[in-house]
Amino acid sequence: MSDLENIDYYDYKALLKRARSQIPDYVFQKDRFELPEIEILIEGNRTIIRNFRELAKAVNRDEEFFAKYLLKETGSAGNLEGGRLILQRRISPELLKSRINDFLREYVICRECGKPDTKIIKEGRVHLLKCMACGAIRPIRMI
């Protein structure tokens, strides 16, 4: 309580300074979130994302969840095999990159602060995206 006794309750700047001092430093950092370069290989009628496991780790999401999203959005059958995602049709690299960016916007990046430090939690029957940086919570649709 001694910290609160020293504050003039009408001094907005002092209160603001105190509140800001209690927020972790990493919240104020402006580091850009960069995804590793996507390694796409087209073999016949199959498209392979060679570094899929690395991509999933970079965005801190389960490989199965990420793969399910890409398979649904590209309208393709496919499977995970040894850290690679194999899609059973030819898909342009531009389309894949676009769908991966859509995934990041919907399931990774916080809409409030723009940071990728989020996790998916479940409360009852609702899935939520919770930001670990700013504390924002928003509902998301599951795949």
Swiss-Prot record:
Function: eIF-2 functions in the early steps of protein synthesis by forming a ternary complex with GTP and initiator tRNA.
Family (UniProt): Belongs to the eIF-2-beta/eIF-5 family.
This protein's UniProt keywords: Initiation factor, Protein biosynthesis
InterPro entries named among the record's database cross-references: IF2/IF5, TIF2_bsu_arc, Transl_init_fac_IF2/IF5_dom, Transl_init_fac_IF2/IF5_N, Transl_init_fac_IF2/IF5_Zn-bd
Species of provenance: Methanocaldococcus jannaschii (strain ATCC 43067 / DSM 2661 / JAL-1 / JCM 10045 / NBRC 100440) (Methanococcus jannaschii)
Protein name: Translation initiation factor 2 subunit beta
Molecular-function annotations in GO: translation initiation factor activity
PANTHER family xrefs: EUKARYOTIC TRANSLATION INITIATION FACTOR (PTHR23001), EUKARYOTIC TRANSLATION INITIATION FACTOR 2 SUBUNIT 2 (PTHR23001:SF3)
Cited NCBIfam families: aIF-2beta, PRK03988.1
Gene encoding the protein: eif2b
Keyword Acyltransferase: no
Subunit structure: Heterotrimer composed of an alpha, a beta and a gamma chain.
One Pfam short name: eIF-5_eIF-2B
Key word Protein biosynthesis present: yes
